[in-house]
């Protein structure tokens, strides 16, 4: 079985998150996207403390597609510097992981 990864991405609103997620799934770059509820992000940006409502998105894919997914997100995202973080999937329900592998690429 090929290595799998969970990508974490944030978006400014649910509409943008859905649009990006649909594109990534339709293009078979990710098998599944989970859009989570609103959250508050607090961070430094260009010398100022920022606080913004965002939504988080979890994306499941093969590890070898991480760079392609990241580049596609950058081309679709409204942020100058979108948050895209990769976390390795170390295990899970084998049937689900097999399905995931079959849906991408």
Which residue ranges define each predicted feature?
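Positively charged, small/polar-rich N-terminal and surface patches that mediate targeting and assembly
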Residues: 1-105
């Amino acid at each position: 079985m090929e290595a799998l990864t969970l990508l974490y991405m944030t978006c400014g609103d649910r509409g943008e998150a859905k649009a990006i997620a649909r594109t990534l799934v339709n293009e078979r770059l990710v098998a599944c996207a989970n859009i989570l509820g609103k959250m508050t992000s607090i961070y430094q940006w260009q010398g100022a403390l920022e606080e913004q409502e965002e939504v988080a998105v979890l994306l499941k894919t093969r590890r070898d597609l991480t760079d392609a997914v990241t580049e596609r997100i950058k081309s679709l995202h409204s942020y100058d510097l979108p948050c895209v973080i990769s976390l390795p999937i170390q295990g899970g329900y084998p049937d689900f992981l097999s399905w995931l592998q079959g849906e991408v690429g």
